[in-house]
Curated annotation (Swiss-Prot):
Gene name of the encoded protein: rlmC
Pfam families in alphabetical order: tRNA_U5-meth_tr (PF05958)
First-level EC class: transferase
InterPro entries in UniProt: 23SrRNA_MeTrfase_RlmC, MeTrfase_TrmA_AS, MeTrfase_TrmA_CS, SAM-dependent_MTases_sf, U5_MeTrfase_fam
Transmembrane segments: none
Keywords: 4Fe-4S, Iron, Iron-sulfur, Metal-binding, Methyltransferase, rRNA processing, S-adenosyl-L-methionine, Transferase
Entry function: Catalyzes the formation of 5-methyl-uridine at position 747 (m5U747) in 23S rRNA.
Source organism of this protein record: Pasteurella multocida (strain Pm70)
Positions annotated as active site in the UniProt record: 346 (nucleophile)
S-S bonds: none
Enzyme Commission designation: 2.1.1.189
Superkingdom assignment: Bacteria
Protein name: 23S rRNA (uracil(747)-C(5))-methyltransferase RlmC
GO molecular function: 4 iron, 4 sulfur cluster binding; iron ion binding; rRNA (uridine-C5-)-methyltransferase activity
């Protein structure tokens, strides 16, 4: 992927950009295998890595704003160079950024100066849906002082960018390296951006996590769906469920595969906004026996009784943050004894440790998903079966 910013040294976010893609994949696959070398790998069906397109794959831009209000600079937080033509973004983002620069000037959104601790506009967060090209635009501001000016100029912005579905101000008053604050002021009637992967509607909300590589994310969810649809299960837990991507894909596939069977899904996620999005997706799919709750996934699980056999899930899906599920939850899952565990991880090192603690389970399938080309990061999906 040619990138003038990398060549000039303006941005080194893509630290492996000079490495051939086949070599990138080989290094990631080797790293993944190293994390599992302490386990019994004799029964693993290794799937070929799921590859990504190499540019234009990101659906989200997180731009720090600096410079002057008449000529704002939109860059990555670690760079001071204008990066609006970053090749990781779709090519049409460049024109959108041009329109947003003009809006910043018209609304008087003075870029926040970190050294002087003055100014208002800290970040612009732009997300695009692959469903219909709809956009969610968020301005991260220090205060609400510019709200009247933003409201005054908003009709002009919507006329220039009719694909804008959700526009909001996020208020982050602290002088700290924090991306966003708690308060979200919506300027549009619509508060969620609809996406669709594999005929499963998903909803992106402000302050909620959503994968930034939709092509690979769709493959990740679709693979989980494919692995699960033939399993003899009808009760599912989806821990750390986010907006419900894994659980809904699996529940819908099982319901289609076994139309006479009642498929029960319980999804747990600490983010209330993500739970709202997941509930909306379940309603749109018409799934009846689905319950999403805003709770700490670990605390929820540990509060359950492994002896309550009637309610024991046959499949537990875990998609934890980088720290993994930890020893305590792994030991609980050994006691709970679901037939299968589907583990999706963004950190193979902690996943390897977790699977080692899932001593009652045998790894059956493993696949790497290259969600972040040109970097050392990747995601991995594993299917474990009770021994």
């Amino acid at each position: 992927m040619p990138c003038q910013h990398y060549q000039r040294g303006d941005c080194r976010s893509c630290q492996w950009l000079a490495t051939p893609y086949s070599t990138q994949l080989a290094k990631k696959q080797q790293h993944l295998q190293q994390q599992l070398q302490k386990l019994d790998c004799t029964q693993i069906q290794w799937q070929a890595p799921y590859t990504s397109i190499l540019q234009g794959f990101r659906n989200k831009a997180k731009m720090a704003v600096s410079g002057m209000v008449e000529r704002p600079i939109l860059s990555h937080p670690q760079s001071e160079a204008d990066l609006t033509d970053c090749p990781l973004y779709p090519a049409h983002f460049t024109n959108i950024f041009t329109i947003l620069r003009d809006f910043i000037a018209r609304a008087g959104l003075v870029p926040y100066n970190i050294q002087k601790q003055k100014g208002e506009l800290k970040y612009i967060l732009l997300t695009e849906s692959q469903l219909d090209g709809g956009l969610m635009l968020r301005f991260v501001l220090r205060s609400e002082k510019k709200l009247p000016l933003v409201q005054r100029e908003l009709p002009g912005l919507l006329a220039k960018l009719p694909q804008l579905k959700v526009v909001s101000l996020n208020i982050q008053p602290q002088h700290a390296a924090i991306l966003e604050g708690e308060k979200e002021i919506f300027l549009t009637e619509q508060h969620t951006l609809e996406e669709c992967f594999n005929q499963i509607p998903l909803f992106i909300r402000p302050q909620g996590f959503f994968q930034t590589n939709p092509q690979v994310a769709q493959g990740l969810y679709g693979t989980a769906q494919h692995w699960v649809q033939e399993l003899p299960v009808h009760r599912l837990w989806d821990l750390f469920c986010g907006v419900g991507g894994f659980g809904l894909h699996c529940a819908q596939a099982l319901q289609t595969q076994y139309p006479d069977r009642i498929i029960q899904l319980t999804g747990i996620e600490i983010s209330a906004s993500a739970i709202e999005a997941a509930t909306l997706s379940a309603q749109k799919l018409g799934l009846k026996q689905v319950k999403f709750q805003s709770l700490d996934a670990k605390h929820f699980a540990l509060a359950q009784s492994p002896a309550a056999q009637d309610d024991t899930p046959e499949l537990v899906i875990v998609n934890p943050p980088r720290r993994g599920i930890g020893i305590e939850l792994a030991q609980f899952l050994n006691q709970l004894a679901p037939h299968f565990i589907l583990y999706s991880s963004c950190n193979a090192e902690t996943m390897g440790k977790d699977v080692l603690h899932l001593s009652d389970y045998q790894l059956k399938k493993v696949q790497l998903f290259d969600m972040f080309p040109h970097t050392s990061h990747y995601e991995v999906l594993c299917l474990l079966e009770r021994k």
